[in-house]
Regions:
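Bacterial N-terminal signal peptides that target proteins for export
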Residues: 1-8
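Bacterial N-terminal signal peptides
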Residues: 9-18
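Boundary at the C-terminal end of the N-terminal hydrophobic targeting segment
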Residues: 19-24
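Contiguous, structured surface segment used for ligand recognition
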Residues: 25-183
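Aromatic-lined carbohydrate-binding surfaces of glycoside hydrolases
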Residues: 56-59, 78, 82, 87, ...
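Intrinsic-disorder/low-complexity accessory segments
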Residues: 91-154, 206, 210, 214, ...
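Extracytoplasmic
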Residues: 138, 524-708
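Substrate-binding groove of N-acetylhexosamine-processing glycoside hydrolases
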Residues: 177, 254, 261, 265, ...
């Protein structure tokens, strides 16, 4: 290729926005010409009604793979595969493989090459001279552009990964004047798969295809581990970068045979710790991690996260998600990928993003019905993640003797959610049932069954006296419910393993501690289980309204404030605002409280005497966080300073993350009447979830009894 023409092109565009500036923030837009009086569209299909495309003579292997995937997508959408055809309405170009003649033709189209030609992985899609023009700056950029065509046709990047088919469409077209340029905000975007038992050569191709659709370009190796050498043939054909010890290796050159190594400085290792694996972290907390500029690793600190180097005020070099159970983190992976490309991808908030993501998979009507199910699922799992229910994490503080049996009340919430899930499943078309099972039903049912298995086993252990289990009907009834949940969980997993002729059997994880048999004080036969189930606690009949048990206690979600006072403006005239954080915390709507901001609550109580005040915040996820202090003043008294941070990886830190809350308590003496509670953030990264004022100072419970 003759690069003189490119140089001429750059000379003509020196006054334009530089690619480096565009790359500092994802540039992604669609615009329509205002002076078009009668908007027209360009059809994707040719005269025969089949989608067709043309492409330059020489392309990289990953581009050819993307074209095959696009062709299959078009068959799913229109009923016919897309075919290469001279003069097609869709014209595709890989810039770094063009001949002089091809490049000259592209220049004449008038596409804004200067905005993306030197950016890695970038692409352009627009209309020119009655054609849909698709241009990639390099091999990956071209492949991503082709996958973007699939997305524009209604094929979600996560559809195939979750056995969902796109909505069929008779006609596909693009409006004249449409123009889109996308440049990744984060240069290296990918996954760390180290220690993943499911990762093998058989699954590499599926994983690489998922990465291509998500526009992820990097596999990360940690501590010298080489997972099957990352299957060199697949890695090379999909143009995937390999990163190890903060160095990334790229294959470059026109013939794609040169290796180039680059040192990475600022890296977000997302959920890399054993205590915070991606599938055990709320999507809302993942979003907090992505948006927090202090959540990163640097080469010089080597696995120590701290404040960004003074030399690096730019975007992170890499975002790497540590994945141990890829079938359970579809939403998180989609979110990470979209935000790595476009800093405004979640500007509407995670709740809106969840709605749009579900719509891309199930359609708008079904998505509106599914969203409340997922919101309740995230609330219940934020109270206790399934992985942290089982041993070796120990017994939880769920107490059957408080608030009319809070243990059974929590399980009843899961019962209601399961019923709603089954009822919705019946209304879905057959071709959405498998996808619904994988994205919605399996996570909900497995979490519910694990909770029931472990909490009822805990109850049986608490009730049974040593050596007397065979004669203790109450303990045996709880044990029977636990074993019944375990048997149902095994059936659920067996169904998943057979789904799609076993296509996911080597990927989904069914051997974790949370999947194992419950630890019980004795054994029961199948016949015993069936009989004892009849005498078990009846959640439909035996549970009374929570408000019945709320005497002498006031519990509130942080978002239920009476007044809120923003933090004083910073020296530059700006200050972070108080923000609600949907899908985060036991409240499912925690409050991010900037340093200096205040929440005030006013309430009435008829109780008199000593009381215990407990504050719950979202635990720190920054290992080098120095302070997370909150002051609490009750009725205008001297504020009590609560240090919410625990030493990283300490027992207290782990217990906070297992619970999903950091707790701090102190005691006060109050009269009856109206009271005020004032909560003020004294440091950054404070996210307040709930608080409780209990006049029964010795009462033990797990879930704050919020009645509103």
């Amino acid at each position: 290729m003759n690069y003189k023409k490119i140089i001429v092109g750059f000379a003509l565009s020196l006054a334009c926005l530089s690619v480096q500036q565009a790359g500092a923030e994802t540039f992604s837009k669609s615009k329509k010409k205002e002076n078009v009086t009668a908007a027209t569209s360009i059809n994707w299909a040719d005269a025969s009604g089949k989608v067709s495309y043309s492409i330059n003579a020489t392309t990289a292997p990953v581009v050819k793979i993307a074209l095959r995937m696009f062709s299959n997508d078009m068959k799913a959408v229109t009923g016919n595969e897309a075919k290469e055809k001279f003069g097609a309405n869709i014209q595709i170009y890989q810039l770094n493989q063009l001949t002089n003649k091809e490049f000259s033709a592209v220049e004449k189209l008038g596409a804004p090459l200067h905005k993306f030609i030197t950016a890695k992985d970038a692409f352009y899609i627009g209309t020119r001279k009655g054609k849909i023009i698709v241009i990639g700056s390099d091999a990956r950029g071209t492949a991503y552009a082709i996958m973007e065509l699939s997305r524009m046709a209604g094929v979600s990047p996560m559809a195939g990964w979750n056995d969902l088919k796109p909505q069929t469409r008779q006609n596909l077209s693009t409006q004249v004047g449409t123009e889109k340029i996308e440049i990744p905000r984060i240069e290296f975007r990918g996954l760390a798969l180290n220690g993943s038992k499911w990762m093998n050569q058989k699954n590499y191709s599926q994983l690489a295809r998922l990465m291509l659709r998500l526009r992820a370009n990097t596999l990360w190796q940690v501590d010298g581990k080489h997972e099957a050498a990352y299957n060199k043939a697949v890695v090379d054909s999909f143009d995937i970068c390999i990163a190890e010890n903060y160095k990334v290796t790229e294959i470059t050159g026109k013939k794609h045979k040169k290796k180039h190594k680059k040192t990475l400085e600022n890296v977000k290792m997302i959920c890399a710790g054993n205590q915070m694996q991606l599938e055990n972290v709320s999507p809302a907390l993942v979003l907090e991690m992505l948006n927090n500029r202090d959540y990163l690793e640097t080469k010089s600190e080597h696995r120590e996260k701290s404040h960004r180097s003074e030399m690096h005020h730019d975007e992170d070099c890499a975002w790497i998600a540590n994945v141990t159970n890829p079938k359970m983190v579809s939403l998180q992976l989609a979110m990470i990928s979209d935000l790595a490309w476009n800093g405004e991808a979640l500007q509407g908030g995670i709740s809106s993003y969840l709605q749009n993501w579900l719509s891309s998979l199930f359609g708008n009507v079904a998505a509106k019905k599914i969203k409340p199910l997922m919101e309740e699922y995230y609330r219940l799992t934020s109270i206790r993640q399934p992985a942290f229910m089982a041993m070796p994490y120990g017994d939880t503080e769920f107490h059957s003797g408080e608030f009319g049996n809070e243990l059974e009340r929590y399980l009843y919430a899961y019962d209601l959610l399961k019923t709603k899930t089954v009822n919705l499943e019946r209304t879905l078309p057959a071709d959405q049932r498998d996808g619904f099972f994988e994205i919605v039903k399996y996570p909900i049912f497995s979490a519910a069954l694990i909770a029931e298995k472990e909490l009822e086993a805990q109850e049986a252990r608490d009730i049974a006296r040593p050596g007397l289990f065979p004669n203790d009907d109450e303990a045996k009834a709880s044990a029977a419910v636990s074993l019944n949940a375990f048997n149902t969980l095994k059936q659920l997993n067996a169904y998943y393993l057979k789904l799609g002729k076993g296509k996911w059997s080597s990927i989904i994880a069914t051997d974790g501690a949370e999947m194992q048999a419950p630890q019980l004080p004795g054994t029961l036969s199948s016949k015993d289980i069936k009989l004892l189930m009849q005498d078990a606690f009846d959640r439909n009949q035996d549970l009374q309204p929570l408000v019945t048990f709320s005497k002498h206690i006031t519990a509130k979600n942080a978002y239920d404030w009476t007044n809120a006072f923003q933090a004083p403006a910073a020296k530059d005239g700006t200050a972070e605002k108080i923000q609600l954080k949907p899908l985060l915390g036991h409240s499912n709507n925690a409050v991010k409280l900037p340093k200096g901001a205040i929440l005030r609550y006013r309430f009435v109580s008829s109780s008199i005497g000593d009381a215990r005040f407990t504050l719950a915040t979202i635990p720190s996820y920054l290992p080098n966080e120095k302070n997370m202090r909150v002051s609490v003043s009750i009725d205008g008294a001297e504020p009590v300073i609560c240090q919410m941070k625990e030493d990283y990886n300490s027992k207290e830190w782990k217990m906070n993350h297992w619970r999903g809350q950091a707790l701090k308590s102190f005691y006060v003496t109050l009269l009856d009447g109206y009271h005020t509670v004032e909560i003020k953030a004294l440091d950054d990264n404070i996210i307040v979830d709930q608080w409780v004022l209990d006049f029964d100072v010795d009462r033990e419970y797990y879930v704050f009894p919020v009645t509103r």
